């Protein structure tokens, strides 16, 4: 299977989860399972993952009216993973490395 991690999901809510609870929100491949996501994060960032929660989103139907009639399409399905790291560990999304805070 290809790398299940696609990109971080940076929203106000996900940033708040990162700051308060040490949880990171990522967009992952829809066919990825929790163990695959956990292994990929531990391998890529070198951190220990405590838990992984996943949420499946179904793509919405979209319609567009044109001169030739109505065209109906569908947005892709996607999956979100909320990953909790061990105490004192963090991930820097932009450099792709993990940081351990001392204290």
UniProtKB/Swiss-Prot annotation:
The cross-references to PANTHER family, in alphabetical order and at most eight, read: 60S RIBOSOMAL PROTEIN L23A
Fetch the InterPro entries from UniProt: Nucleotide-bd_a/b_plait_sf, Ribosomal_uL23-like, Ribosomal_uL23/eL15/eS24_sf
Q: Which residues cross the membrane?
A: none
Q: Name one GO biological process term.
A: translation
Does the keyword section mention Cell wall biogenesis/degradation?
Answer: no
Assembly and interaction partners: Part of the 50S ribosomal subunit. Contacts protein L29, and trigger factor when it is bound to the ribosome.
Functional summary from the UniProt entry? One of the early assembly proteins it binds 23S rRNA. One of the proteins that surrounds the polypeptide exit tunnel on the outside of the ribosome. Forms the main docking site for trigger factor binding to the ribosome.
In the record, the note on similarity to other proteins reads: Belongs to the universal ribosomal protein uL23 family.
Q: Which domain of life does the protein's organism represent? A: Bacteria
Q: Which GO terms describe its cellular component?
A: ribonucleoprotein complex; ribosome
Q: Which GO terms describe its molecular function?
A: rRNA binding; structural constituent of ribosome
A UniProt-annotated Pfam family: Ribosomal_L23
**Record's keyword terms, sorted:** Ribonucleoprotein, Ribosomal protein, RNA-binding, rRNA-binding
Q: Would you tell me the protein name for this molecule?
A: Large ribosomal subunit protein uL23
